[in-house]
Amino acid sequence: MSDFGARRAHNMDAAVYGARAAVIGGATSTATVLAGQMFDIPVSGTMAHSWVMFYKDEFTAFEKYARLYPDATVLLVDTYDVLHSGVPNAIRVAKEVLEPMGKRLKGIRLDSGDLAYLSKRARKMLDDAGLKDCRIVASNSLDEFTIQSLVRQGACIDSFGVGERLITSKSEPVFGAVYKIAAVEEDGIFDPRIKISENVEKITNPGWKQIYRVYDENHKAIADLLAGRDEEIETSGEVEYVDPNKPWKHRLFT
């Protein structure tokens, strides 16, 4: 188990000393590089979704990463579709990029969806491709109960990255938000980027945006409408609101 909690820690000191406490408590490594430097803790980690989203396609992102870190290539395979895109592209990189260099794919990481099911399917795909030594790392709001459940389900997971449930206490919870690339500027043009996920709430809205805030007759804010940068919203009449997490829920504002 590795400490992945820095971005959800309450401040920098909490991230650094929390990593130290995690290792004292049994974690084998941390993704917080500063803690590794200060306390001689083994450092481990994988790529971020932003790395994958920056490039035009997933294979190119994996290839660039593998060439940069050939001895420690762990690929994050859930940016778009784990079983139909992520794992197949990881296998392709292992065969076409790493093996010609005399290297092996160290691992893949699952960060959303049904981790037990996906890990079993991914394990079979890797084994069938001759990558039985490729490890599977799992993360996504894990705690001791979730990990115990995954083990009981026979999940094919070799290691766990635990963040917010390790580095913060339940009495002082974290704000559940993420920061993803929405667009990449190329020659003055903003090219939209999207994060697809097995968890609907993790799917991002691509492109440069603007926000309209809706107030009621008592001047109380009741909704925010998200629109594209060049999209014009007619505010003199009715405006339809669609809940991004529950698209079947619609509401009209005037």
Language-model region placement:
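Buried, small/hydrophobic-residue-enriched core segments of structured protein domains
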Residues: 1-131, 142-146, 152, 187
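Short hydrophobic "strand-cap" motifs at the C-terminus of beta-strands
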Residues: 139
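Hydrophobic residues within beta-strands of alpha/beta enzymes
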Residues: 44, 108, 136, 158-160
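Gly/Ser/Thr/Ala-enriched C-terminal appendages of enzymes
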Residues: 127-129, 134, 142-254
